[in-house]
């Protein structure tokens, strides 16, 4: 028993001694965590350099855009061919992707040899050989009668400008075919395939093997957004935000970047890490000074590194008693498969002895232990370096997504990773140690990168087909110049109908006289109350007017839905309650003040303090109001309360209030526009044109109520099925059709209807219509403004959609943003066409060649939407080129305008209370 313990002790001591000896000799190959963190920082800097337009030419890590913008979503379908060129064998594959209720992939493949005379010969011969193999495969599988899309996995660095193109930057591994560098390899393959008349193949995608690996794994796990190869060579790809890729135009979405990390260090960034053995190996390689990171990691070089170390250790007498065999002197005699065999847990030492004996050496027990440890240090360093670079990519993904913790999947492939017994667990352990805030799943690509090329092709086919369907829907909202001119001219005709006595009753644009005859002259003064009713909020203001200065105090009150859609008496009692609260709040209880009432609904007026409601809009439905004088209803509610008395001087529309507010600042202002919850315009019209009011002298403000434009069907040619659905689901079906295409209250609902349709077609949200998406009104217009903001990254768009209960992918977010853009752009253009009709009419009425005018504008859509105001202004400029139109934002809203109109009325003190 004692003897057994003695032998065990001796062996353990021997092992420890040998390990220490090797550790001392290979001290520089053992990398601490501190060193790995430093390497991460260097790799991050190189990635940034590669992504920058100005710095890319000198970057060693090329960060090549692949033009792969989407990963599989499970809806891919069809038959695809795939070629895989990049290793010692060449593979042709047929992939059948079908849904049938579940994801299903069937593959048939054939391997063909890649002789050295082909890989290092003439480029034309190389591609002819590939085309011959493809033709043979198609003939064998009876596919020559079919036209099939093809994905080409090409495992060498290429610069791409599109998915189906790739210019070879340089050969790597053992390839050296002449005349291929700086040429488009897809074009070279297509030319070679043309020599086979029976081949009808469409090359849809060129992908790197890492991209293929990522796509293969992403088909099984949608969280996969990184691909890593650790085999003959080494490389990684990952999904990068487009906003960070300077080399490609556009900021939307993500694109897969082929890092080509094998060249990391080619600029000297890793000189302090490289050892004498790395330098010796590099000098004896096919491409000295190139792919230095790869030469410290990949399977092509690992065995050779071990051989060089063993040779040196033998030379200095640390191994084999100083003996060296001719095999140990021979390049390539130790391969990576030998390293893997020597590091096996149980058979490792026996394998080591056998391999060393085959090399003509006579190893002792201690030699075998030492050699095994050399292999461990070399392969562990490889795993450490890979882990540092991968950890950098994972950190970048986490930071791009602005997450405290990232959950992601890395697709893995490569013979070294797959066949080395210790490599995967070492890599995983170090990665998790370097990025503790990332939960990483490592997924082995069972079918290799060739299936991935087919998946890229399948995704490209799907995206192409989906793009056509999406474009078809969006095209409905793209108005041509001719269509916009048509809207302008029809609006002009409707304006005329509304002004004329004979046609007024049939006109959709009501052109209501407001009895506002003039603008402030700056002499107005006093204290005035103003009410502003027109949306879900109601505002009460105290306005103090002094010579050329206005001070305002206001309070906002909510109008609950049950009040908006209850009885008229309840609505006006609620308004009076709000006035009472405000007077109390301002310490004016019992004060008798002149009041201006901004009432943003169509009213027929016979004088300035009388307004008969024509019809509710914007979601209001209070009963017993339509056809009634709303000023009388307000007076009666004040009487019912019996707490205070107010002198109601004027009732004005919000557009009139806006025009007056801006007119106080700019005498040229004679048009008011509201583009908010609702949409409307007023303007100063010549009295001679207003047939509903007696008198031809001077001008009067006309409230167009243009929201009703199109109620007679005159713009049905540009109304879409979605507009019709929104109209049918509204409180006032068949009414306010123009407003329903242009105002904030309805744009979100149009977007929601489009999203439902696209989802139904399987183009969004994985074809799943959530309960939330079925809910009317979830898509408020403020979300459109947020989603379309140029400053907002897609990640933030996704967050907005998630707040709405919509679980969207990056691709979904792009489509949602496009839909929002199409709907709001059309709204702005139609508003612009309507405005062009008004300014052109004013120009012609005054007989002017050139007309200069200011439009006072208010409304949340105009103020908050990032593009609405610009598009509206551009449209007016294009459709009314002889008019110089300035748009002035009404900072203080239409409430101030009501007070100004009241002030003007009091100043003039006309018994009729006309202005």
Swiss-Prot record:
Q: Kindly indicate whether the keyword Lyase belongs to this entry.
A: no
Transmembrane feature ranges: none
**Lineage of the organism:** Eukaryota, Metazoa, Chordata, Craniata, Vertebrata
Q: In which pathway does it act?
A: Carbohydrate metabolism; hexose metabolism; Carbohydrate degradation; glycolysis; D-glyceraldehyde 3-phosphate and glycerone phosphate from D-glucose: step 1/4
What is the protein name stated in its UniProt record? Answer: Hexokinase HKDC1
Where does it localize? Cytoplasm; Mitochondrion membrane; Photoreceptor inner segment
What is the membrane topology noted in the UniProt record heading this document?
Peripheral membrane protein
Q: Top-level EC class, please? A: transferase
**Gene3D superfamilies per the record?**
3.30.420.40, 3.40.367.20
Residues of the region (Hexokinase large subdomain 2) are 653-892
Q: Keywords, A to Z?
A: ATP-binding, Cytoplasm, Glycolysis, Kinase, Membrane, Mitochondrion, Nucleotide-binding, Repeat, Transferase
Q: Which GO terms describe its cellular component?
A: mitochondrial membrane; mitochondrion; photoreceptor inner segment
- Provide the phenotype resulting from gene inactivation: Embryonic lethality.
Residues where D-glucose 1 binds? 155, 172-173, 208-209, 235, 260, 291-294
UniProt binding sites for ATP 2 = 532-537, 677, 744-745, 781-785, 860-864
Which amino acids does the record list as binding D-glucose 6-phosphate 1? 84-91, 209, 232, 413-415, 449
Using the UniProt annotation, give all residue ranges assigned to the region (Hexokinase small subdomain 1): 73-207
């Amino acid at each position: 028993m004692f003897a057994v313990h003695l032998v065990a002790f001796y062996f353990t001591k021997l092992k420890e001694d040998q390990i220490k000896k090797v550790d001392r000799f290979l001290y520089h190959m053992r990398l601490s965590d501190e060193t790995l963190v430093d390497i991460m920082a260097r790799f991050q800097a190189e990635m940034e350099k590669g992504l920058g337009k100005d710095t890319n030419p000198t970057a060693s890590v090329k960060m090549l855009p692949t033009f792969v913008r989407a990963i599989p979503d499970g809806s891919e379908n069809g038959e695809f061919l795939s070629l895989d060129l990049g290793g010692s064998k060449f593979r042709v594959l047929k992939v059948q992707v079908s849904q049938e209720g579940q994801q299903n992939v069937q593959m048939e493949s054939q391997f063909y040899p890649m002789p050295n005379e082909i890989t290092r010969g003439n480029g034309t011969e190389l591609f002819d050989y590939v085309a011959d193999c493809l033709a043979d495969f198609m003939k064998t599988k009876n596919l020559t009668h079919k036209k099939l899309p093809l994905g080409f996995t090409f495992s060498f660095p290429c610069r791409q400008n599109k998915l189906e193109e790739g210019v070879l930057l340089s050969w790597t591994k053992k390839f050296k075919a002449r005349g291929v560098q700086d040429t488009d390899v897809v074009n070279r393959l297509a030319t070679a395939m043309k020599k086979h008349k029976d081949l009808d193949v469409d090359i849809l995608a060129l992908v790197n093997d890492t991209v293929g690996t990522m796509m293969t794994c992403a088909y099984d796990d949608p969280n996969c957004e990184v691909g890593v190869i650790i085999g003959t060579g080494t490389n990684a790809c990952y999904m990068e935000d487009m906003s960070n890729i300077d080399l490609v135009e556009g900021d939307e979405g993500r694109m897969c970047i082929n890092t080509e990390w094998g060249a990391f260090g080619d600029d000297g960034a890793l000189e302090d890490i490289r050892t004498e053995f790395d330098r010796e190996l590099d000098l004896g390689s096919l491409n000295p000074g190139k792919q230095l990171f790869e030469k410290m990691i990949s399977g092509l070089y690992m065995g050779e590194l071990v051989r060089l170390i063993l040779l040196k250790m033998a030379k200095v007498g640390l191994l084999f008693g100083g003996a060296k065999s001719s095999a140990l002197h021979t390049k390539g005699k130790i391969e990576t498969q030998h390293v893997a065999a020597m590091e096996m847990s149980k058979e490792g030492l026996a394998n080591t002895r056998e391999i060393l004996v085959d090399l003509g050496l006579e190893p002792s027990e201690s030699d075998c232990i030492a050699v095994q440890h050399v292999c461990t240090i070399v392969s562990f360093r490889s795993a450490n370096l890979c882990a540092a670079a991968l950890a950098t990519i994972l950190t970048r993904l986490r930071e791009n997504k602005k997450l405290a913790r990232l959950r992601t999947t890395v697709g893995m492939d490569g013979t070294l990773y797959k066949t080395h017994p210790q490599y995967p667990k070492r890599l995983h352990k170090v990665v998790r140690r370097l990025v503790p805030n990332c939960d990483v799943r490592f997924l082995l690509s069972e079918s290799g990168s060739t299936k991935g090329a087919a998946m890229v092709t399948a995704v490209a086919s799907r995206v192409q087909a989906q793009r056509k369907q999406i474009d078809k829907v969006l095209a409905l909202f793209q108005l041509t110049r001719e269509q916009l001119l048509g809207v302008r001219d029809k609006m002009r005709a409707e304006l005329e109908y509304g002004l004329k006595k004979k046609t007024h009753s049939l006109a959709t644009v009501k052109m209501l006289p407001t009895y506002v005859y003039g603008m402030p002259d700056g002499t107005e003064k006093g204290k005035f109350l103003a009410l502003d009713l027109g949306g879900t909020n109601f505002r009460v203001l105290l306005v103090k007017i002094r010579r050329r200065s206005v001070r305002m105090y206001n309070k906002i009150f909510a109008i609950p839905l049950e009040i908006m859609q209850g009885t008229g008496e309840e609505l006006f009692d609620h308004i009076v309650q709000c006035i009472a609260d405000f007077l109390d709040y301002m310490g004016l209880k019992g004060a008798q003040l002149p009041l201006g009432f901004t009432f943003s609904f169509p009213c027929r007026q016979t004088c300035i303090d009388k307004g008969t409601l024509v019809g509710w809009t914007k979601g209001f439905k209070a009963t017993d109001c339509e056809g009634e004088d709303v000023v009388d209803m307000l007076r009666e509610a004040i009487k019912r309360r019996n707490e205070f008395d107010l002198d109601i001087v004027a009732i004005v529309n919000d557009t009139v209030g806006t025009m007056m507010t801006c007119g106080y600042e700019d005498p040229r202002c004679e048009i008011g526009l509201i583009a908010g919850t609702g949409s409307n315009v007023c303007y100063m019209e010549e009295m001679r044109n207003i047939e509903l009011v007696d008198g031809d002298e001077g001008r009067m403000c006309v409230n167009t109520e243009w929201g009703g434009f199109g109620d007679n069907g005159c713009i049905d040619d540009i109304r879409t099925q979605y507009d019709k659905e929104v109209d049918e689901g509204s409180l006032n079906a068949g009414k306010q059709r123009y407003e329903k295409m242009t105002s904030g209250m309805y744009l979100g609902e149009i977007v929601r209807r489009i999203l439902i349709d696209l989802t139904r077609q399987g183009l969004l949200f994985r074809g799943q219509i959530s309960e939330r998406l079925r809910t009317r009104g979830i898509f408020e217009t403020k979300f459109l403004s947020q989603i379309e903001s140029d400053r907002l990254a897609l990640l933030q768009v996704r967050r907005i959609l998630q707040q709405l209960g919509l679980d969207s992918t990056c691709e979904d977010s792009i489509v949602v943003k496009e839909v929002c853009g199409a709907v709001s752009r059309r709204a702005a253009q139609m508003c612009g066409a309507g405005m062009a009709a008004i300014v052109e009419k004013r120009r012609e009425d005054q007989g002017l060649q050139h007309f200069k005018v200011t439009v006072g504008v208010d409304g949340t859509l105009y103020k908050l939407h990032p593009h609405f105001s610009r598009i509206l202004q551009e449209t007016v400029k294009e459709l009314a080129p002889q008019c110089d139109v300035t748009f002035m934002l009404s900072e203080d809203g239409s409430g101030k305008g009501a007070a100004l109109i009241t002030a003007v009325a009091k100043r003039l003190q006309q018994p009729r209370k006309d202005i």
